[in-house]
Amino acid sequence: MSIFLQADSLSVAQNALAETVPVEKTISIWELLTSGGIAGQMIMIALFIMLFFAIYLYLERLMAIGAASKIDNNFMLQIKDHISNGRIDSAKMLCASTNSPVSRLIQKGISRIGNKLEDTNTAIENAGKLEVYKLEKNVSMLATISGAGPMTGFLGTVVGMVMAFHKMASGGGQIEVGALAEGIYTAMTTTVVGLIVGLIAYIGYNHLVVKTDKVVHQMELNAVEFLDLLNERK
């Protein structure tokens, strides 16, 4: 008889313990992203718009810069051969048929053959500045997003914190700690998303800068090589 009583007591104790153990509340990523109220949701929308533009700008510039860096290794050899043998028109046609910043620089220089070397150099430099401007088009927007993303996320966190403490004040200070903590970690979500957006834009920006510098270096080398060729013809 006592054995049954002990078993019943143990069962009651286990049930009571199960009732006192708090059930862990789970939340999906989507619920976390959209749980910041109207203000938080608007800031999240702004952050995702920034993320979309950052990815789009990066991919668009990456393809454009990649296309600009492609040039036939024999291009300058053919230019040297044409100019050395007086085939200026053939050199111009070769440049016109090659779509690259280097070919446009050389084409500008060929059009100045017969003028002073300083004038030719100036024309090539001006054409080079235009090509660099084309390469760097919209790249600065990535730098802007890399800074604006984290700041926008931080703004969302501040707004969320203000709303959480306003809710506590409106309740006369009688608010559960769990509810306050939920409001705080929801507000912190915008900072996390903002940092992710800023990091993606920052890495993309620096990668494009490195690739642009390589193309500019290639342009400078070919421009110097062309000017040396003109100097030898004198």
Language-model features: locations:
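Juxtamembrane non-transmembrane "cap" segments at the membrane-aqueous interface
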Residues: 2-20, 157-172
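Hydrophobic membrane-targeting segments
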Residues: 5-75
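Alpha-helical membrane-interface segments at transmembrane helix boundaries
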Residues: 30-43, 125-146, 177-189
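Residue-level signature of catalytic and energy-coupling elements of molecular machines
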Residues: 37, 55, 91, 106, ...
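Lipid-exposed faces of alpha-helical membrane segments in multi-pass integral membrane proteins
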Residues: 42-59, 145, 152-155, 193-200
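Predominantly long cytosolic amphipathic alpha-helical stalk/bundle segments
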Residues: 68-175, 203-234
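Hydrophobic alpha-helical transmembrane segments of polytopic membrane proteins
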Residues: 184-204
